[in-house]
Amino acid sequence: SPREMATTMKPEQVTGVARDLGTKLRERGITMDFAPVLDVDGGSANGAIGDRSFSGDPAVAATYATAFAQGLREAGIEPVYKHFPGHGRASGDTHKQTSRTPALASLKEVDLPPFGKALSQVPAPVMLGHLVVPEWGDLPATLNPAAYNLLRSGDYPEGSPYDGVIVTDDLSGMKAISDRFSTPTAALTALTAGADIALWITTDDLPKAIDEVDAAVTDGRYPREKFEASFARATSLQPDK
């Protein structure tokens, strides 16, 4: 687990582990890994992240997540940092229920700095979590323009402006979303809020989602220039042949 790696290995050893893993993934035709977790562990109150977090210390979490991302990158695999703006101290498991974070000021003190540090050292895509931040109302971060604006602006400690790819967590199989929204509605809401890639785990709703996005671009609810910018960012991840 990431926790075990952080307590038993040096960062350069973790880079080697990730490089070996990435090599095996690439041999199987996989070019992206939705890892590493940048969440800062909040203790037993949040079992959703647990030992997927490298550490409860923001600096340690950032160091080891960056080392892991570097190893994947060296193997030709695109890493993805998650779960912005920080799941480690949130209440509840987004697979099962709504999950609420501490106040934004607390996120900026503890949970957000690792994202800034990691992105400055090994730039990579970022996955948003289905996290409700008190100051942003009741809409989860994956569907909330405020979350995308914060990530893009870099307006948090250690942060800087970000123009990379942003992907959502799963929009179809996690109750924090599926209890409230259909998959096509969630996908369109995420894209118009600022996501570049709307992720879900089945193809069942794909035709309807495509139709809804097409209609939204046509009628202006999803501005064409915004759609084209996201498309350009997403397709920039296509691997070298």
Language-model features: where?
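A substrate-binding/cap region within the structured catalytic cores of diverse enzymes
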Residues: 1-73
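Hydrophobic face of alpha-helices
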Residues: 18, 65, 210, 228-231
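Secretory-pathway/luminal and periplasmic proteins that interact with or process carbohydrate-rich
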Residues: 45, 91-92, 239-241
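Short, cationic motifs built from Arg/Lys/His that form the positively charged side of catalytic pockets
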Residues: 52, 82, 152-156, 233, ...
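Second-shell residues forming the walls of enzyme active-site clefts
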Residues: 59, 63-215, 221-222
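Mid-to-C-terminal alpha-helical segments outside catalytic/metal-binding sites
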Residues: 215, 219-241
